[in-house]
């Protein structure tokens, strides 16, 4: 009689939390006088994960590296551009300090410190922004301004930038709101003349207008799956006032605009003095004298310039700087390829003359640091193709002739082990 009673009670086991019976769930875990189903376990896990996210989010704001710490980290990955790194370090520190300040009870409202980077191709603009984001452990995304159009026209809406940022943090809105957005080629959306256009300029001034609110700070409605907005779909609300926007561009010809202004103001002043140096030195020095009115003359609208209060200029990299980039940073190009060859059990060596030749080639191409990888990849292509099929290779040596005369790298073989055990 007792055994029969026990058997009947087993048939009526149910979850102590949701009251679902055993046959209604996939798994029911029983404990002393209590049971829990797999659905409730998953729900508890979700609740705990959200709590942990909130704790991590709050602790990240509390622990803020100083401008010195930020600059020192940038030095590990970015060669040269000392003034730009210092400007960025202070601006980034002030931005995240402002976010922390917003949580305190103070009536003083701090403005955003969005950043405009001006410098030639391959000078390190994108690398600076990416390195900052990785150091601060915040989401980072990069957008190309030339692909953006006004809402309603063929192309990408500016809100797609936020969608890309959300993707980087698994659609965690709170985390995305502490992220960094880098908009490249911002100079390419300048209007064609100083006067406002009476026709639609959907990829120039129109994009600047579309970006205004986004950069300044607004609550944007972002489609969860990207693309165009539809009235039927739900939107994610993203507060962009907490997102740091960094815009960058080469601004070819801006030095001439600055020079004309300075010549008009004082023909025997700074502009006349720097003409005594080299052309590149002139351009670098002129860019450091940039004023908002110069950017307006170039084609950016005043309202857009006002949203980018911090301006940092980057110099064109010298041959010496390119050589340092090849070997000094923690993720230097030569170190990356040496690690790649080590996976094959082979040592890769670059002679000093080879590094100089690579730098000279990049200077001739006028591609800056960006062109270094394509040069190194080109000279190592055949070796990397053949190496996995070759036996007993001990070392590969890249000398100057490999770069300048397209000769094959020197390969040193180890003695085969012929000992019979």
UniProtKB/Swiss-Prot annotation:
Segments forming domain ClpX-type ZB: 2-56
The entry's keywords: ATP-binding, Chaperone, Metal-binding, Nucleotide-binding, Zinc
InterPro entries: AAA+_ATPase, ATP-dep_Clp_protease_ClpX, ATPase_AAA_core, Clp_ATPase_C, Clp_protease_ATP-bd_su_ClpX, ClpX_bact, P-loop_NTPase, Znf_CppX_C4
GO cellular component, one term: HslUV protease complex
Binding site for ATP: 120-127
Family of the protein in this entry: Belongs to the ClpX chaperone family.
Protein name: ATP-dependent Clp protease ATP-binding subunit ClpX
The organism of origin for this protein: Baumannia cicadellinicola subsp. Homalodisca coagulata
């Amino acid at each position: 009689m007792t055994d029969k009673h026990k058997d009947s009670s087993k048939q009526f086991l149910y979850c102590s939390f949701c009251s679902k019976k055993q046959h209604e769930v996939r798994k029911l875990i029983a404990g002393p006088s209590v049971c829990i189903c797999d659905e409730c376990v998953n729900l508890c896990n979700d609740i705990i994960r959200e709590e942990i996210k909130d704790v991590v989010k709050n602790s990240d704001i509390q622990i803020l590296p100083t401008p010195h710490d930020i600059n020192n980290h940038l030095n590990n990955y970015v060669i040269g551009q000392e003034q730009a790194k210092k400007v960025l370090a202070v601006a980034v520190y002030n931005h995240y300090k402002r976010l922390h300040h917003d949580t305190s009870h103070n009536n003083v409202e701090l403005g955003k410190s969005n950043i405009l980077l001006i410098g030639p191709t391959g000078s390190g603009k994108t690398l600076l922004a990416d390195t900052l984001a990785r150091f601060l452990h915040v989401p980072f995304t990069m957008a190309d301004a030339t692909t953006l159009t006004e809402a309603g026209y063929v192309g990408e809406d500016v809100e797609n930038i936020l969608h890309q940022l959300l993707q980087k943090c698994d659609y965690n809105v709170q985390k995305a709101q502490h992220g960094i957005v880098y908009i490249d080629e911002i100079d390419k959306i300048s209007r064609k003349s100083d006067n406002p256009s009476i026709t639609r300029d959907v990829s120039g001034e129109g994009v600047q207008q579309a970006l205004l609110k986004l950069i300044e700070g607004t609550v944007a409605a972002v489609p969860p799956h990207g693309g165009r907005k539809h009235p039927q779909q739900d939107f994610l609300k993203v507060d962009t006032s907490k997102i740091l926007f960094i815009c960058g561009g080469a601004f070819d010809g801006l030095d001439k605009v600055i020079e004309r202004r300075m010549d008009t103001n004082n023909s025997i002043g700074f502009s006349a003095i720097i003409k005594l140096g080299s052309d590149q030195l002139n351009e670098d020095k002129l860019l450091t004298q940039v004023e908002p009115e110069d950017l307006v003359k170039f084609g950016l609208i005043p309202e857009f310039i006002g949203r980018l209060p911090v301006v940092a200029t980057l110099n064109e990299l010298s041959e010496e700087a390119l050589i340092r980039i090849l070997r000094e940073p923690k993720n230097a190009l030569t170190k990356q390829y040496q690690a790649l060859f080590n996976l094959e059990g082979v040592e890769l060596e670059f002679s000093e003359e080879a590094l100089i030749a690579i730098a000279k080639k990049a200077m001739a191409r006028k591609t800056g640091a960006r062109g270094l990888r394509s040069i190194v990849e080109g000279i190592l292509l055949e070796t990397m193709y053949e190496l996995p099929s070759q036996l007993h290779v001990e070392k590969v040596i890249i000398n100057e002739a490999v770069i300048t005369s397209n000769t094959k790298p020197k390969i040193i073989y180890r003695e085969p082990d012929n000992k019979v055990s």
